[in-house]
Amino acid sequence: MASLPSYQDAVSPDWLPLVAPYVSPKDYPALCGVNRRYWDVFAPRIWSRIPRSDTVTGLDDAEYDLDWLLNSVFNGVSRMRSETLSLVRVFDARSIRGTYSLSMGVNLNTKLKNAVKFLPNLNCVLIDGHEDLDPSESFAEVGHQIQLLSMAGCPVSLSIKFINTLRGIVYLDLSYASGSLRPLFQDDVLPELRVLKIQGKEVDDTTVENLTARFGTRLWSLDLINNKLTDQALDSIGAHCLWPANLRSDTNFDVEGKLEFGCTTPDFGTWTRIVESEWSASFSHPNRHFVDAPLYDLHDTLPQECVSKRLDGKFPVKSDAADAVCRGLQGEDPYFPPASFQASQGLTHLNVSGNRVSSLGVMKLLTLCRGRLEQFSCDSMMLVPPLKGTMAAVWWPKAAKLYGFYATHTLRPVLSSNLRVVKLHHSVVTQIPTLELEGFSSMACLHIAENILLPRAEMAFPEPFVPDMNPRITSLTLTHIPRRSSGPLINRLVSFLKLLSAQERALFDLSSRRGPSVLAGLRHFRLEFEQDAYEGDAYIAGEIDAEELLNSGDKGFSFFDDEAGGRPRPVRELATSPPQKRDLTEFSVSQGEQDLETEHLDIDVWVDGKSTTVKVWVGSASNESSNPMLRDYRELALHCKVHDRIGPASPAQIRAGVPSSALVFHTAWCMAIMPCRHKSATIKEPTRVELDAMKDVLSELKQFRLEGRAKYLKLQGQSANGTCPPGPPHGFWLGKLEVSTHQGTLRSKTADYWR
């Protein structure tokens, strides 16, 4: 048995590994020749990944091609020392051009196959976008040792035989690759799979049902971007992939509130109501920014790692990106050991952007996820499921689509206990929905959404997301943000940045004195903008560079400067569809109910496996003259019989006027954001003058940041020690703010871009 190290050896780490990260990679080859100790430190940095980055090889990315890789690197594999070959763990061909010379003679995949069999420890393969590489052929003999395979965009499919050899694979990315997913449905296939990415694979609800039933809680990350999923798929994910143990508790009742559970219905799930404490509804408890204290077992019967408890919020979220998982499997992650990437306690990372889900489906999933999700992405969702074939469709404006997410209470830690990284439609913060109306321009839709729908959305859901609603969230991405605004959108985003600055100051004050550990707060805020909606000269809009616009100190560019003096457009009204003849009898019967002074409807629902009658709140008849949103909700419930998604009132709905203990029709409530049949609420197209007044959101945000930074630097210069605390009075947020625009290609702006 080896002797234990001395105390001095144990507390005095070798200095060489400590300084290695700061050494220039171009010096690695020379340092390997110093002695064996240096070789042990620097040789893995050269050979762990093939091809190595240009910082080691001295080659530019443009010089990488498959000819170079196979002829200069793999040709000499058979003559290299086995000790050196054993260092190779990653084959990353993503930066290499996907073409090769016909003069190579030997088939590309055959040559690669002959080379990789000399690499006993190769376990990560990344070949995204390559047309010439077929993993089923190239890596047939080493499939059993592969733990990560990323082949997004490859026009080849994996053979069933090869998939059966991937017994130890942890990460698999088949996004936009050719071939069916049917091989994944075999019994006892991919037993160690933990991360599955299948973007753009035409996946439907049935496929997700089969997939989730097959893998269950084995997956901790599932990426389903750009498929054909509806709310039914979210139900399948919630039923099969989430670990059964509940992370929610009443321990933090004073700070966060607590949950009260009721019956279970098929379309809404378990009725879950938030019971507020004296502080929780205002998100103002003095202890809201502290990390969780350690949880001790009263009887000391379980090891601490086996106790089911939420994360304390102190450490970052484990990433499911290919590079991050690759580093983690090699033991290079500073926070998570390789075992954490290979183990699973159910789904924690879910991405369903680019699908056909609704906000109600997302609300149900987040409500019933037992606090397990740590990272959730859904860039756009319909406000309600499709209305075709229902009486409600008669009252919804013809050919209208509404997108948004208002269930902000589901992001609170009392429900989403572990949620740290979020990507959602911008309405979660701005309360402004995305509107699509047939016959109306994009600019007109933006104006209508801000000036007609926003006031109604504020009536329905008077509780937008704010940073202290969940200070455990560290990263927030808002999507589908319009480039043009008549004012409300700009004001909402600016107000949110001010709240971020205020949170930053509160955390700074707490961390500057002795006390419990403090949460990081929201440190990464990303804004994803849509393409500019200007339609008068589309070719001009396509040439506008957002970076140049934001970096300039000039007034924001106006697309309408040449037309400001033009005559207003004739006003058009969007009429609602007249009732069809077959519906008149039903409407007249419902009108009789509406004339009653009832505030509740008796509805038969299927609860816990049996039919039960419940009372659902429909509003008071006295609200018809004072609150148009409540008036339309009542009409949708009584007149149109929109009686689905029955559930407890959310905190926002209670603030809007719903009794705290009431049940509501959630679909009807969301639909009431859109004006119904009332003549006074007819949607009119804005005039050219009104559209001319809309400002560029990017330009206004840039101006706000420049003014805040100027104040910050001035206060910093006036300080005796040259420092300035965050927050008021300058209000300049010091976190990482990113912007992306969809103009030609997606361009991302770094944090320095805003400073």
Label each residue range with its predicted role.
Residues 1-107, 133-141, 159-163, 184-185, ...:
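N-terminal adaptor-interaction module of cullin-RING ubiquitin ligase components
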Residues 15-18, 111, 524-529, 533-755:
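Extended, C-terminal alpha-helical/coiled-coil scaffolding tails that mediate protein-protein interactions
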Residues 41, 49, 53, 57-77, ...:
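Extended, low-complexity alpha-biased scaffolding regions
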Residues 87, 339-354, 411-418, 465-478, ...:
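Extended HEAT/HEAT-like alpha-solenoid repeat tracts in very large eukaryotic scaffold/adaptor proteins
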Residues 91, 125, 147-151, 170-174, ...:
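Conserved hydrophobic beta-strand positions in leucine-rich repeat
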Residues 113-117, 137-145, 160-169, 183-192, ...:
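A structural signal for leucine-rich repeat
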Residues 236-343, 380-399, 429, 435-455:
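Acidic, serine/threonine- and proline-enriched intrinsically disordered linkers and terminal tails
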